[in-house]
Regions:
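Chalcogenol-based redox active-site neighborhoods
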Residues: 1-134
Length: 134
């Protein structure tokens, strides 16, 4: 797994953001590389670059080892993301990949919680296995 942050801000803005903001919000600072996409080329490839404003909108992508996008989330600038939900989804995608799709993770699934085993015996019986409130 590799996590990267990418924005149209310069590496100098990232440095100040890390030192003055993130280090106070996240113990030890942001633990992942921050990429500068000053021209918006990376953002344009992923459809998050706003050319008129010269910035990327908030986007999150989970890309599997084969380079296939498994999840996309795009938010307008005033709304932040929840890191825990991103981590939960990443763990779910990793689990499904590890089992080659023989096991799937239901909505709200968390590491260590029951999974669903794909097969005809599950049809019409999901409610017996999946208890979202537990």
């Amino acid at each position: 797994m590799q996590v990267l942050s990418c924005s149209t801000d310069s590496r100098f803005v990232h440095k100040i953001w890390q030192e003055q903001e993130l280090s106070k919000m996240v113990g030890g600072g942001f633990p992942f590389p921050m990429l500068s996409d000053a021209g918006g080329r990376i953002g344009a490839v992923y459809g998050v670059y706003d050319e008129a404003a010269g910035v990327d909108v908030r986007g999150r992508f989970i890309i599997d080892p084969d380079g296939i996008i498994q999840a996309i989330e795009m938010l307008t600038p005033p709304v932040g993301r929840k890191v825990g939900e991103s981590l939960r989804q990443l763990q779910a995608f990793q689990h499904v990949r590890k089992t080659k799709g023989a096991e799937v993770c239901p909505a709200g699934w968390e590491l260590g919680k029951p999974i669903l085993k794909v097969g005809p015996e599950l049809v019409g019986r999901v409610w017996e296995v999946w208890k979202p409130d537990e």
